[in-house]
Each structure stands twice: as structure tokens, then as C-alpha cells.
Amino acid sequence: MTNAKTLYQKVWDAHIVASPEGEAPVIYVDRHLVHEVTSPQAFSGLKVAGRKLRAPEKTFATMDHNTSTRSASLDALSPMARTQVETLAQNCKDFGVRLYDIHHPNQGIVHVMGPELGITLPGTVIVCGDSHTATHGAFGALAFGIGTSEVEHVLATQTLRQLKAKTMKIEVRGHVTDGVTAKDIVLAIIGKIGMDGGTGYVVEFCGEAIEALSMEGRMTVCNMAIEMGAKAGMVAPDQTTFDYLAGREFAPKDEDWAEAVAYWKAIKTDDGAVFDAVVELDAADIAPQLTWGTNPGQVVAIDGKVPDPLNEANPSTRASMEKALEYIGLSAGTQMTDISINKVFIGSCTNSRIEDLRSAAVHAKGRKVASGVTAIVVPGSGQVKAQAEAEGLDKIFIEAGFEWRLPGCSMCLAMNDDRLEAGDRCASTSNRNFEGRQGRGSRTHLVSPAMAAAAAVAGHFVDIRKPY
């Protein structure tokens, strides 16, 4: 099949507005998501230039990065955070942008809120001034993060200049065993190819293990595509996708729905399409994962040990490992299950959806958070919070000693009041474990929600496949 195309190539080709010779192509943007941190300068630029939004109905805004998870009052915010959320509110009013502010029942993390409202649709191009925009690729959308100057350009023109990426297929064959989640799959992938293994590529995740995931699970996988260096991550839409989207606020309705599904079914990689790179994993080989260092690629199975830099032949990699161990405060050869923690964070755009909270609640139910451990659960949106409370998950967490919070980005990044102190060691369901990511001098271990909840009650990391 000479004209066979990949999923990415089909979406890309359908969005090219112009391809000037010797220049980067111009592509159309279907959905633009904005938040309070990366948008102020963009709106200011429009005001200075006297420009209006090209398509205000295709721009959606929320407040998430700097918001408080303890109170919905503006008085709970720092002066800078308050300025940012008030500025976003004024900009949205001035330019006619739909805003989900801190008092809106659907407010939440932009990458949680967008999909659950049906803003995210297969075959679309979605951008946001946030690196984890790749999350939306779980629906077969081409979604990627952009800088503030590009935010302004999209607001003004609804287009972007972009160079076409290379294509990579990551196939996870077979099925995972009990206790292994989408978070473990993507951490295992990053551990295999490294933090730069996907640089220059748009990755398509496929295989039986990916197809078996819920939409929440697929979003977790695509969310961390950026952590392997990829421009974006995508999963071909299928019946799981359609069932998730049906009836959501911004999804097509009635006869438009049938027409949309017919189109979406064609958005998949053709037989015979050639990828620039292919990576394969056997799902049965994946165990619950746990990072030991200061990037997501420094990861091992829960039944493993902290690796020894002396066993690394590459001098640069060895030096990186030594630096990571010095910062993280661990010794080579330490059993992962012997690592104690004093903080737990269940939340973020990676793992704060209803499925994630249900998974964590299984390990919290009937137990108590260990002495000396502080654990917080932050639902990803108002909808997730309401659903969790309707199911009684909040009571399970509270009775176990977890703190139940309001939606927001929270402890994923040290940009709001939820942050770690120097020396804290945290089991976190977020996506980055860089030095100082959760607070100056903090030490972060990335895990699944189930692993995080289990660590909270045990006081140390445990293999959730075994009694503890």
C-alpha cells in the first residue's frame, strides 16, 4: 500500500493550511486550552497590537496551576497567584473566552477537564501552554505544548508554524498482570528508551495492553510521552473512545454524532504504513514501577534494587546516576521496598481521574495512614471530585487519615502552597521527579495511585501484588 499513512500523518495532513517552500508548514488548531500561568503575556500582546481572537469559541480557559486545594477563596492565594487568576478572568471577559474559574463546578486541571467535557475529540489538533498537553493524544488527537509567544499566535490566528515530526510506534504486546497499571506501563517504556528516546518523534502507542486500557489509562500513558522526549503521544480511537465521549457537553450530538464516529473510525494507522522507529515491550514482563533517581527514566520494578552506577559502562550515564543518588539520598543495592516515605501525593494531570482514585481507595479502605506520614488526595476536577464523593471514596480516604482536597495541580510542582520541605521523601503519582520539582530539596518517587496509597499506609514502598 504505497500511500499508507500513520495515525499522526493522517491528522497532520488534514490540518495543513499552507506549506511555503523552504519554511515550516502552517497547521490549523482546532482547540486551544489556556490557564493562568502561561497566558497573561499572550493576551497582553494582543491588547498592545489591537488584535481580537480569531476563534474565541475554540479557546477554553481554566485556573489550575496556582489555585489553592484548601479553599476556593481568592484570599487563600498568594499575591502572585491571585494576580494571575484575576488577570485570566479579566482577559477571558475582555476577549470572550469561556472560563472555568475556581468557583465553577467543572473547574480543574486543564488536561483532566478538557477530555471529560468532550472538548478533546479524535482527529483534532489541540495545543496548550503546558508541556503535558500530550495527554489529549489518548483520543487520537495531535496534542502538544506550546510557549507563550505561540499562545499569542494561536489566539490571533488559530494556526501555528510547525515542522513535521518523525514517527515512532511503541507496541506493548500481550496483557499486564494483576497490580500493573497504565502508570507502570509508561514508566517501563521510559525506563527502556530513556528520557530522550522519543526526541523528534510523535509516538503512537499500540498493542493489546494499550487497547485494553480505559480512556483514563490511555491518558496516563500519553501524558508522559513528553517525559521520553516525544513531541506528542497518540492512541488510535476505538469503541472505548467513542463510549467515553458519547453525551459529553462538547461532543457531537444526534446525527452529527454518527457522522463523527464514522470519520473517527478511519483515523487509524493503515496496514503497511512505515514508522521511522519501532519499540516493542511484552506487557507480561512489566511489574509495578518505582523511580529511584531524579528523572522518570531512572526507574526499576518494585521487587528490584537501587542500581549501582559502577555497573554502568557509559561515563556520562554513570555520572548522572551518581549525582541522582547523592540528591535522592539512597545507596546502590537498597531494596526498593526498604525505602521509607513521609509524604504521599495522589493527584496531577497524570493520575487524578476517577479510575485513579478508585484504585488508590482499594488500598486505603479499612487501613490507616502510617505514623509520621502526611498523605493528600487531590481530584483532578470538580466532576471527578463530585463522582468520587458520590461513590464514598472521600470518606474512605478521610477515615484512613488522608487529606481530601479541592481540584488543582497541587503538589505536582512547587508553584502553589502544596509543596514539600527539604528532605521530604514523597510517593507521588505525578509525572516528574526532577530535583526540587515538588519543593526545594524535596525527593520524589513516581508511582501509580495504588502504589502511592499502599506506601501511605505502610510507611514505605511495598509490592502491591503481595500481602503487606
Curated annotation (Swiss-Prot):
Q: Which organism is it from?
A: Shewanella baltica (strain OS155 / ATCC BAA-1091)
Q: Which NCBIfam families match?
A: leuC, PRK05478.1, PRK12466.1
Please share the entry's free-text remark on the cofactor: Binds 1 [4Fe-4S] cluster per subunit.
Q: Which GO terms describe its molecular function?
A: 3-isopropylmalate dehydratase activity; 4 iron, 4 sulfur cluster binding; metal ion binding
Q: Does the keyword Lipid biosynthesis apply?
A: no
The processes (GO biological process) annotated in the record are: L-leucine biosynthetic process
The alphabetized UniProt keywords are: 4Fe-4S, Amino-acid biosynthesis, Branched-chain amino acid biosynthesis, Iron, Iron-sulfur, Leucine biosynthesis, Lyase, Metal-binding
Return the protein name.
3-isopropylmalate dehydratase large subunit
Its quaternary organisation is: Heterodimer of LeuC and LeuD.
Source gene?
Answer: leuC
Record-linked Gene3D superfamilies: Aconitase, domain 3
